């Protein structure tokens, strides 16, 4: 049963990775588009009818096409991206038809459609051409490959077009009605019951980019802003929890308190929420605190009718104020939600830590023992081929940090690791970071323990080191010592 649950978790996290890989690389485009909207739409700072045309073109055509390209590229590299763009043409056109408008009630931004059908088209291309791609006569590769991609894309346009009208149409109608019900009956606060536990299970990207972003962008198109972008990205709950750990363990556990202190600015200003997830996992009852605080924060946002004009990603307070709709109520609502959710999270977390102090200490000891045990597992040890007499020498010239999206937390961990290598005068090791889906032939990998199963499934023959979190400096020092011993 446990193995089945582990497999389900891996599949869900893989879906999360695919969804985030379509949107995370183009956050800069969302920011630029959001600035265009904030300046030039009729309700913007400097309305301009002509310049506002760029806003509509960007949200209707450009952004969905790029999302589809990245979705296909993650499945089958450039060829997968190209066929996904062909499918995006069909999906976007479907959202402009009268049949779709009759179902949904309006023309729609087709993010959901391109996120589904783009990767599916790339999968079909990948698994059909593998049977004959290596049999092409020399000199005909370009001709055959391009014609096959073109003909297959042409064939897939038609099912994608009609499925987008009817299947995606009714899905979007259902989601639209759900959002309208939440708005009408003031139900946004209860969204925290789903969002906060899912974040701790590293499904934050799936929720934010797979669900809230497409719905939010549709709301922006209709009303100029959306509260949905703020439901997952509010850094208040995590900030309060980290400060609670800093205070509660200041004398009890200096190392844990120090980790919480160093994680707080990264969480608040860097927008990397993953840094507080391990603290919740040390004491799972704190999930109740994050849920309660999420309800408080979302409630304040709803009372003030606050919203942003574009996705808040990463979930930084800087990005939040940059994208917030520029009216006094919106700005005040966001600021108040941030402050009160942080304070409430601090108080509830301190209360729960105090009430369960003995259990907490025991849990911390068990967690430390578990980490120590992980360091002795094959995942921590340099892997060797099954050769009884001669050990295989490991190539440490490049170390790859791996996280789900390959952007936020792994970038931070790689930077810390580079600094520790520099402090020890080790200059012959290159440190890079990647997403799990981008792994190919890496020899040495560092990741967090929660992602070990997925990394192992992708690169079973690599040397994989796991750490408790990407801010674990002591874990990095331990790995560096092992690398030095292996090299010597």
From Swiss-Prot:
One Pfam entry name: PTS_IIB
Domain PTS EIIC type-2: from-to ranges: 15-362
Entry's localization field: Cell membrane
The keyword rRNA-binding is assigned to this record: no
Segments crossing the lipid bilayer: 27-48, 53-73, 148-169, 179-199, 290-309, 332-353
InterPro entries noted in UniProt: PTS_EIIB-like_sf, PTS_EIIB_2, PTS_EIIB_2/3, PTS_EIIB_mannitol, PTS_EIIC, PTS_EIIC_2, Sugar_PTS
Molecular function (Gene Ontology), one example: kinase activity
An annotated GO cellular component: plasma membrane
EC number: 2.7.1.197
PTS EIIB type-2 domain span: 397-488
Residue numbers on the Cytoplasmic membrane side: 1-26, 74-147, 200-289, 354-488
Matching Gene3D superfamilies: 3.40.50.2300
Modified residues (Phosphocysteine): 403
The protein, known as: PTS system mannitol-specific EIICB component
Organism per entry: Mycoplasma pneumoniae (strain ATCC 29342 / M129 / Subtype 1)
């Amino acid at each position: 049963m446990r193995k089945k649950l582990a497999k389900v978790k891996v599949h869900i996290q893989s879906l999360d990775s695919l969804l985030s890989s379509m949107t995370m690389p183009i956050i800069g485009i969302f920011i630029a588009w959001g600035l265009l909207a904030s300046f030039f739409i009729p309700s913007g700072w400097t309305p301009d009818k002509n310049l506002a045309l760029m806003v509509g073109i960007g949200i209707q055509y450009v952004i969905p096409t790029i999302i589809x390209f990245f979705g296909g590229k993650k499945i089958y590299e450039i060829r997968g991206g190209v066929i996904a763009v062909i499918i995006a043409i069909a999906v976007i056109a479907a959202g402009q038809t009268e049949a779709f408008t009759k179902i949904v009630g309006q023309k729609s931004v087709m993010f959901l459609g391109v996120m589904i059908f783009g990767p599916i088209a790339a999968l079909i291309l990948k698994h059909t051409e593998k049977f004959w791609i290596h049999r092409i006569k020399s000199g005909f590769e370009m001709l055959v490959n391009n014609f096959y991609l073109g003909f297959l894309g042409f064939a897939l346009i038609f099912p994608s077009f009609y499925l987008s009208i009817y299947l995606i149409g009714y899905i979007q109608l259902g989601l639209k009605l759900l959002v309208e019900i939440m708005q009408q009956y003031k139900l946004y606060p209860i969204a925290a019951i789903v969002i906060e536990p899912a974040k701790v299970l590293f499904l934050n990207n799936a929720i934010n980019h797979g669900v809230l972003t497409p719905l939010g962008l549709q709301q922006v198109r209709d009303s100029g802003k959306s509260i949905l972008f703020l439901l997952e990205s509010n850094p208040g709950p995590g900030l309060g929890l980290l400060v609670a750990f800093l205070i509660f363990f200041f004398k009890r556990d200096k190392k844990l308190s120090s980790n919480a202190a160093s994680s707080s600015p990264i969480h608040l200003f860097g927008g990397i929420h993953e840094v507080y997830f391990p603290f919740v996992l040390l004491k799972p009852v704190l999930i109740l605190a994050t849920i309660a605080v999420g309800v408080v924060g979302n409630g304040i946002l709803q009372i003030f009718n606050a919203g942003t004009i574009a996705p808040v990603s990463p979930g930084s307070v800087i990005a939040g104020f940059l994208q917030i709709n520029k009216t006094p109520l919106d700005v005040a609502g966001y600021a108040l939600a941030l402050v009160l959710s942080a304070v409430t999270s601090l108080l509830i977390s301190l209360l729960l830590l105090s009430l369960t102090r003995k259990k907490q200490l025991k849990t911390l000891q068990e967690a430390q023992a578990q980490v120590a045990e992980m360091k002795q597992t094959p995942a921590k040890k340099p892997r060797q081929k099954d050769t009884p007499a001669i050990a295989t020498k490991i190539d440490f010239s490049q170390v790859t940090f791996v996280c789900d999206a390959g952007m936020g937390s792994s970038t931070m961990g790689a930077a810390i690791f580079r600094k520790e290598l520099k402090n020890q005068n080790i200059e012959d090791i290159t440190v890079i970071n990647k997403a799990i889906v981008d792994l190919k032939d890496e020899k040495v990998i560092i990741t967090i323990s929660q992602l070990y199963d997925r990394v192992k499934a992708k690169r079973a023959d690599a040397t994989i080191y796991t750490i408790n979190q990407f801010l674990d400096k002591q874990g990095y020092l331990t790995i560096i010592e092992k690398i030095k011993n292996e090299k010597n």
